[in-house]
């Protein structure tokens, strides 16, 4: 009957795998939207989120001297004005979700090392925390998330063991 179904639901876990990249604004927006939906889900404690690593551009060369806006314009063959309009639209979408994006401050960074750190953080049950601080550091603070010192500081911020994080 119904009670058996309810009991089965309360004992089972729902695993949601999320494939995303730290340099993708829509991944950050999707994360926030998913979290808001999860807050309304009566069985949210039964949901296990597994962050998977996906690089949108594995060949991206880190360049802290160019903004993501400039890089996107160059890579797509768009004008800087058009790219800023696109970025402003995404920034407004983010603001609607309580996020602050600054594409002119965000730097072009290969996300491989950030993903390596995420996989390590997951082994210590800190994947969710690291995911959030990395996205915030990239989109809001304009941090170079391919820089070792930046990654170590973010790891320390959420309590990851320093020496292990450096490996």
Predicted regions and their residues:
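C-terminal cap of thioredoxin/glutaredoxin-like
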Residues: 5-6, 11-21, 26-43, 47, ...
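Structural alpha/beta surface segment adjacent to cysteine/selenocysteine redox centers
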Residues: 32-138
